[in-house]
Amino acid sequence: MADVYPVDPAFAADARVTREQYAALYRESIEHPEQFWGKAAQRLEWFKQPTQVKDVSYALDDFHIRWFGDGELNASVNCLDRQLATRGDKTALLFEPDSPDAASYPVTYRQLYERVCKLGNALRNLGVKKGDRVTIYLPMIVDAAVAMLACARIGAVHSVVFGGFAANSIADRVIDCQSKLIITADEGLRGGKKIPLKANVDAALKIPGTNTIETVLVVRHTGGAVEMQAPRDRWFHDVVDGQPAECEPERMNAEDPLFILYTSGSTGKPKGVLHTTAGYLLFASYTHEVVFDLREDDIYWCTADVGWVTGHSYIVYGPLANGATAVMFEGVPNYPNVSRFWEVIDKHQVTIFYTAPTAIRALMRDGAEPVKKTSRKSLRLLGSVGEPINPEAWRWYYDVVGDSRCPIVDTWWQTETGGILISPLAGAVDLKPGSATLPFFGVQPALVDAEGKILEGATEGNLVLLDSWPGQMRSVYGDHQRFIDTYFRTYPGSYFTGDGCRRDADGYYWITGRVDDVINVSGHRIGTAEVESALVSHPKVAEAAVVGFPHDVKGQGIYAYVTLIAGETPSDELHKELVSWVRKEIGPIASPDHLQWAPGLPKTRSGKIMRRILRKIAENAPDQLGDTSTLADPSVVDSLVNERLTR
């Protein structure tokens, strides 16, 4: 089995970036960042050209991150207006519905522009002003992109909430950013099932603290019956359709906020990752063009949901700023059958396909036949995102899906980074299954030990980034101190990613997974603290500890240890009740895969739960527990080992 897949000479001959160009551009981006990013800024259309490029200090006593600080622009103008002259009739978004029996349809750049302008005008009429926050809780439909771009047009800050989150999660996010308006739909569709979006919003808005919401706009999507509460609730199309199809864009400073996106942290509630306008848009569009080797006639399909950062950067902002055609898919990989992805690729002649290892591993289980009965001849490049891809899944993706002729870009990045940081460029970098390979322009990875000492050569350590890049998040919304403490205090002078990583003798990077209390489930980050607090909020639960464990399909699963209050006894009914309790509190993605009853939890004498031990038990590695003598009650461990659910 090949360990290295060299660059295909035919691909390299026509690639946007060759091996030599990558080396030269990377060197320039590190040695002369002002010059490099100053030139790159010409990709964008500005109302006022920036004269400053980079103004960054990671010093804790003078901390700031500013890019293109005196420039003025508008993100929606860059995604829509500037495309109209040459690409007005080109398809911007190709909508593919949940059911293959429903009609798919193209939306051109001109049509998208008009829809965005109409919604922008409607939002202004409803009192939404520059800087106001708007919550978007929609399925994967074109109106989700319209809503994001309409906010950008009028200078409102959008906060998209994934349609799989439950009422409590919506309320948390509304309260945290003091949102003024929600855009939702009657229902979503996923794998033939209806998701009660409007009902979830109604439940969320009964929770104290959500009364900043003045208006709920409801897209009629399935036509399902919903309760409408006047005057708060309005039908989206009643409010929007009659508006003028031109809308004056707001002039935004480069560092004005574009959006907030909530992501799980290792402590407590999700944090609102704040991205600003120019640096984010530049980085999303530049990485999209270069990493995916974009051509004018490509049909590009990223299977992510707009509720995650991948959907923000690589379905909406990156592709549209580049004038590309992107598929927007409402469905799931296995509905109505496990050939659905490949059928959609053939139907729309998709050339670039970007998905998550979880989807690949799930589809691998059904073997090659459901793939091989489709053509997939249109494909020329494959991508992977969301979590490390194991070499077996990589090879299956390469051999079976790509017929051993499409390079794979295995992209590592985070909600916080705005865009891809480590990835091969298919015309420039030889591939190794399981490795994200080399850094993108301007990105300076380093590996450090626990003390923060930089490690050289082939080694393993904690992944940090030594300097800023334009797409970097600027703050945690409403809590700048938390931003500094989370990312810059652990290893002063650098950004701590929270990921472990090894570097091989060729300088390639291999991401090994989170080193903090965050679990990566199917490419979605879940904070263990979130799941624990959901469990503990149940009246019968005294204590809970949650860890990740290796999962064949999801990458990591959720393993919960639960101690009940005195007088309560474990039962199958209570087990089911607790799992559905977590689903209700957070959403289905946070459902525990295993829930083990624990008479007690392993604690130090100071009362700290020893998660390291719980992790090893969940990983079915009881021989690797290490020293348990420092525990307040070492006997607790034996009973947990004996009752473990993963052996």
From Swiss-Prot:
Domain of life: Bacteria
Residues reported to bind ATP: 386-388, 410-415, 499, 514, 525
Requisite cofactors: Mg(2+)
SUPFAM superfamilies: Acetyl-CoA synthetase-like (SSF56801)
Keywords: Acetylation, ATP-binding, Ligase, Magnesium, Metal-binding, Nucleotide-binding
InterPro entries: Ac_CoA_lig, ACAS_N, AMP-bd_C, AMP-bd_C_sf, AMP-binding_CS, AMP-dep_synth/lig_dom, ANL_N_sf
CDD domains per UniProt: ACS
One example GO MF annotation: ATP binding
Keyword Magnesium: yes
EC class name: ligase
Protein's UniProt keywords contain Metal-binding: yes
Gene Ontology cellular-component terms listed: cytosol
Gene Ontology BP, a term: acetyl-CoA biosynthetic process from acetate
Signal peptide: none
The protein, known as: Acetyl-coenzyme A synthetase
Organism, scientific name: Xanthomonas oryzae pv. oryzae (strain MAFF 311018)
